[in-house]
C-alpha cells in the first residue's frame, strides 16, 4: 500500500489536474476521512480515513472547450443526458492517460446505489476538499422560512454558482499522511442576510439562475449553455 505526503500527492495528481484543466475542469484532493466526518453513516465510503480521493468540478469554459465539440460530432444521438456522457468521457480519458497505473474508482454525481442513495454527496465532498463552501439552512440563525424544507447549495469563490460538481475519484490503496492538510473553503457569503438571499434564490427562484451571481464572478455560462441546460432539465437531463 502506497503512502504519500504532500509532495507525493502533487506528483501523482498534477498531470491529471493539468489534463482536466485544459478541458475546463478543476480537481481538488481530499482524504476519505474528511468526507466521512461530515456525512451520515449511511453515506460514508468504506475506505480508510487516509485514502486519497479527488473531487472534479466543471467550469463554464468546459461548455465551449468540450461539450459543444461533443455535440457537433453527433456523439449524443439517443443519449438521455449528453452532458453527463461528455463529462464521463472526458474524465475517463484523463484517468486512462494520467492515472493508468492506479486503481481508481470513479463515481459520477448522477449515479445511484441500488438503495437509491447517491454514490456520494457531491456538495459535502466539494466543501471538505476546499473547492466550494456548502451553505445550508443550518448556517442561518432564526431563518425566516421557519420549518419550510430548504436545500443547501455550494458557492465557488471565483465562479459563484457557475460550476457543477461532476465526480469523485477514489485512488484505492493510496494513503496520504499528515502532509496533506485540510484547507476550509472560502466563506464568500458570510452575512446572515446574504445567506438568506442565496438560499431563497436557490430554492424559490432557481430557474432564474440568480443564485449563481450571489457574489461577483469571473466566468459565467454562455447563453447557449443556459438554453441547452434548461432544455435538458425539462426533458429529464441535467446541467
Residue ranges of each PLM-predicted region?
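Auxiliary alpha/beta "docking" domains used to position bulky ligands
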Residues: 1-239
Amino acid at each position: 500500500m502506497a503512502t504519500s505526503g504532500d509532495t507525493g500527492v502533487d506528483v501523482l495528481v498534477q498531470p491529471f489536474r493539468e489534463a482536466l484543466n485544459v478541458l475546463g475542469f478543476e480537481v481538488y484532493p481530499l482524504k476519505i476521512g474528511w468526507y466521512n466526518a461530515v456525512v451520515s453513516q449511511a453515506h460514508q465510503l468504506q475506505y480508510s480515513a487516509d485514502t486519497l480521493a479527488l473531487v472534479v468540478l466543471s467550469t463554464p469554459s468546459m461548455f465551449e472547450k468540450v461539450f459543444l465539440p461533443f455535440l457537433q460530432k453527433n456523439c449524443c444521438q439517443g443519449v438521455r443526458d449528453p452532458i453527463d456522457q461528455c463529462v464521463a468521457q472526458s474524465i475517463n480519458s484523463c484517468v486512462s492517460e494520467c492515472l493508468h497505473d492506479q486503481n481508481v474508482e470513479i463515481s459520477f454525481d448522477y449515479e445511484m446505489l441500488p438503495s437509491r442513495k447517491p454514490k456520494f454527496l457531491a456538495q459535502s465532498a466539494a466543501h471538505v476538499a476546499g473547492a466550494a463552501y456548502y451553505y445550508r439552512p443550518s448556517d442561518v440563525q432564526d431563518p425566516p422560512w421557519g420549518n419550510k424544507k430548504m436545500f443547501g447549495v455550494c458557492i465557488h469563490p471565483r465562479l459563484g454558482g457557475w460550476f457543477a460538481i461532476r465526480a469523485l475519484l477514489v485512488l484505492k490503496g493510496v494513503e496520504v499522511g499528515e502532509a496533506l492538510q485540510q484547507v476550509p473553503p472560502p466563506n464568500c457569503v458570510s452575512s446572515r442576510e446574504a445567506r438568506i438571499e442565496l438560499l431563497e434564490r436557490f430554492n424559490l427562484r432557481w430557474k432564474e439562475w440568480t443564485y449563481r451571481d450571489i457574489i461577483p464572478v469571473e466566468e459565467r455560462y454562455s447563453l447557449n449553455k443556459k438554453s441547452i441546460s434548461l432544455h435538458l432539465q425539462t426533458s429529464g437531463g441535467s446541467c
